[in-house]
């Protein structure tokens, strides 16, 4: 089942109208006339990861290769929303894997990051989901993921710390078990 079945957009629009009304806005004023429709459309876009599957985003782009050395895609920008406040967190992901006979099409790594980032999420889970997806698709000897992000829920509200960055990492297989492999990855993303 798709996350936004037909007709659900209308209820999203109605909910945004109600939110605007509840915060004291005049929903009939000129600047807000189309806001509920635009906000519903934006929310569908920002949460489009619910509409995607791993099979769809990788699209069988797995290729035979004798390479067993590290493959790293660095600085993949990501935009997500925290599940606690529904505020954005923005950053980048570094994803590496050690192939075992198969390599994944380059753009597919970024598409995996996007699919999971475009869901209500916490960064810790996002990092793990990316790593496990790459592992599942490639059957790699190891996968490493580091995500660095700035969280609007910490910058705009609460403690209001604008210069903090959260860093999470997940190491699977050889990256977890072999300190030299892990160190090589970490040195490459500096």
From Swiss-Prot:
Query: How is the subunit organization of this protein annotated in UniProt?
Result: Homomer.
Family annotation (PANTHER family): GTP CYCLOHYDROLASE 1 (PTHR11109:SF7), GTP CYCLOHYDROLASE I (PTHR11109)
**Pfam family name, one:** GTP_cyclohydroI
**Which EC number(s) does the record attach to this protein?**
3.5.4.16
InterPro entries named among the record's database cross-references = GTP-CH-I_C/QueF, GTP-CH-I_N, GTP_CycHdrlase_I, GTP_CycHdrlase_I_CS, GTP_CycHdrlase_I_dom
Highest taxon, organism lineage = Bacteria
One CC-aspect GO term? cytoplasm
Keywords attached to this Swiss-Prot or TrEMBL record, sorted alphabetically, are:
GTP-binding, Hydrolase, Nucleotide-binding, One-carbon metabolism
Q: What is this protein called?
A: GTP cyclohydrolase 1 1
Q: Name one GO biological process term.
A: tetrahydrofolate biosynthetic process
Q: Which organism is it from?
A: Pseudomonas putida (strain ATCC 47054 / DSM 6125 / CFBP 8728 / NCIMB 11950 / KT2440)
Question: Hey, which pathway is this one from?
Answer: Cofactor biosynthesis; 7,8-dihydroneopterin triphosphate biosynthesis; 7,8-dihydroneopterin triphosphate from GTP: step 1/1
* Catalytic activity reported: GTP + H2O = 7,8-dihydroneopterin 3'-triphosphate + formate + H(+)
**Molecular function per GO:** GTP binding; GTP cyclohydrolase I activity; zinc ion binding
As for family, the record states: Belongs to the GTP cyclohydrolase I family.
